[in-house]
UniProtKB/Swiss-Prot annotation:
Keyword set, alphabetical order: Acetylation, mRNA processing, mRNA splicing, mRNA transport, Nucleus, Repeat, RNA-binding, Transport, WD repeat
Composition-biased stretches (Low complexity): 7-21
Modified residues (N-acetylalanine): 2
WD repeat locations: 53-94, 97-137, 139-178, 180-221, 222-261, 264-303
Lineage, top ranks: Eukaryota, Metazoa, Chordata, Craniata, Vertebrata
GO molecular function: RNA binding
Record protein name field: THO complex subunit 3
SMART domains given in the database record: WD40 (SM00320)
Role of this protein: Component of the THO subcomplex of the TREX complex which is thought to couple mRNA transcription, processing and nuclear export, and which specifically associates with spliced mRNA and not with unspliced pre-mRNA. Required for efficient export of polyadenylated RNA and spliced mRNA. The THOC1-THOC2-THOC3 core complex alone is sufficient to bind export factor NXF1-NXT1 and promote ATPase activity of DDX39B.
Name of the encoding gene: THOC3
PROSITE patterns, sorted: WD_REPEATS_2 (PS50082), WD_REPEATS_REGION (PS50294)
GO biological process: one example: mRNA processing
Self-association and partners: Component of the THO subcomplex, which is composed of THOC1, THOC2, THOC3, THOC5, THOC6 and THOC7. The THO subcomplex interacts with DDX39B to form the THO-DDX39B complex which multimerizes into a 28-subunit tetrameric assembly. Component of the transcription/export (TREX) complex at least composed of ALYREF/THOC4, DDX39B, SARNP/CIP29, CHTOP and the THO subcomplex; in the complex interacts with THOC2. TREX seems to have a dynamic structure involving ATP-dependent remodeling.
Localization: Nucleus; Nucleus speckle
InterPro entries: G-protein_beta_WD-40_rep, Tex1/THOC3, WD40/YVTN_repeat-like_dom_sf, WD40_repeat_dom_sf, WD40_rpt
Amino acid sequence: MAIPQASMGPSSLGQSGPGSMAPWCSVSSGPTRYVLGMQELFRGHSKTREFPAHSAKVHSVAWSCDGRRLASGSFDKTASVFLLEKDRLVKENNYRGHGDSVDQLCWHPSNPDLFVTASGDKTIRIWDVRTTKCIATVNTKGENINICWSPDGQTIAVGNKDDVVTFIDAKTHRSKAEEQFKFEVNEISWNNDNNMFFLTNGNGCINILSYPELKPVQSINAHPSNCICIKFDPMGKYFATGSADALVSLWDVDELVCVRCFSRLDWPVRTLSFSHDGKMLASASEDHFIDIAEVETGDKLWEVQCESPTFTVAWHPKRPLLAFACDDKDGKYDSSREAGTVKLFGLPNDS
């Protein structure tokens, strides 16, 4: 696919134009009032609690749009849904039906009762928590590893291991379009306006397509190595990418320039999540902590200690609560104890 190349992101300091580092990048002079306020909050709410969810490692966690439920997808071929009751997660149901690992899941953007799972069994399944049943199974051409729901709720995009992205009508459950890419496709996402579709790829690029036309708009050389994950901030101002170079880069949605880099992790960045107000960014990797940064300055706001690599993080859509899931613990005796747990950070220390 011939897409015009933009200039390099984090390593192109001083350049301007789409895809470059903004020249106004500056180092913060001290903690902002927001950072100090959130640090004060987390000093009293720094507890992390574990909740049994699955019989094998958890690949994906996501909150419903109203924040009442958390869903998790696992290597054990199931999805679990929890209700958030005050300061704990109560398991509501386990969803069976997939014949292989559930690699990613997401909720409908505005209907808190529907979520969709992507599996290595070459299907996606749409589930309704009201009936606890699968309302649709859609067969796809390959083993599915990435999935997202369009902001208008009308389309589900699913990416497979063969770098094919299929666009599925959320009402008819039929394929509307299919794109085969000539590069390794990692995470996929619409922008908040629903008129562009973003892909991160194995060459360190962000590929941007118009939507629904799926015509190439731009390719940004975002990182010198594999660009793994992408998330849009709920305010629509920024998006962030995480890379195998251990950097998180923050991009201006309108200008497509890199405005900031976060470099406290040492391992490839696997997962990202913006807080509900767009002011905090959580990023995680094989490092044994989750970095929580203030978006506007890049300053470290907090770090959540982990005992193993983190696969997935998700901020609650209304509260400063962070759900996450880690790899199984190392060691013969510890590994089975933590396999399949979902964790929640931000709980009161005395809870």
